[in-house]
Amino acid sequence: MHNPTRIQWRRGLTSLIIAVLRFLVHSNLFISLATVSVAVTTIFLANLPLESLPLFIVFAATMFVYTVNRFTDIEEDKQNVPQRAAFTKRYGRYWLVTGIALYIAAVGVAITLGLSGAAYLFLPLVVVLLYSVGGVKRLFFVKNLVVGLAWGTIPLGVGYYYGQLRSLEILFLFVYITTMITIAAVIFDIKDIEGDRTEGISTVPNRFGPGWARISSLVATVVVAAAVVFLIAAGMLSRRYLVVLAMNAYVSMYIPFATSDRGPLYYGFVVDGEHVFLMVIVLLTEWLVW
């Protein structure tokens, strides 16, 4: 016989874990951790010393951009992700204040320390204006590219901070991250099909269908993996960069299951968690192999 107390305890634990994950996703803490993961991955793969300041800057900029976006997209979220819309309506103003404060702090620290690239910290504000206010998200596929490029600037920012902007490793990670995030952005649009149609936003899934979006994204992921292997085989990149193929494998596994009825945790935790996964794999290989 099953122990009722144990079953109830397991259900309670499961509910608690789900509640915590939803909080991390809806509050943008998890997506901010994901962008920090990109910075950490870049630092280790490019053999740079780990410092806290660039990580803080990335975290603060992400929290600011995504929290503002929650407010500008709240009408779409009411249909696509009602739980997130409810969270934003109830707690969003507190997280908005937090995001703005962190962003101002990051800019202030950069200026105070005399960082040469401090002016580039205004790029997140430009992204917010273009994407959320300027109507870029209504342009077919352009919004996916903007998201991809925004994430791709993280390796560039890390490279600039350490004076390695033109190194092959940094440039490779810029292209790689930009491409992989663009693919993820297309997959993300699958959950937003109905809301995007209502708002008149044209995306790959609502123009060609979710099936075509999954197939094209999977093909693109395989092509990226093949390009990585080619660069390594040609001696342009170290064999250490084979580790990024772990993310291609991860992405290839979640793409087939991306449907419009998947909950916010699938997209906000599983899909957005791809870079956290890659960071963990990179750290493990650095510790155990290299």
What residue spans do the PLM features occupy?
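Helix-coil boundary and interhelical linker segments in multi-pass alpha-helical membrane proteins
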Residues: 37-57, 105-119, 154-175, 227-240, ...
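Small-residue-rich segments of transmembrane alpha-helices in multi-pass membrane proteins
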Residues: 33-39, 86-94, 145-161, 206-212, ...
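Intramembrane alpha-helical segments
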Residues: 83-163, 254-263
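Extended hydrophobic alpha-helices typical of membrane-associated regions
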Residues: 81-87, 236-290
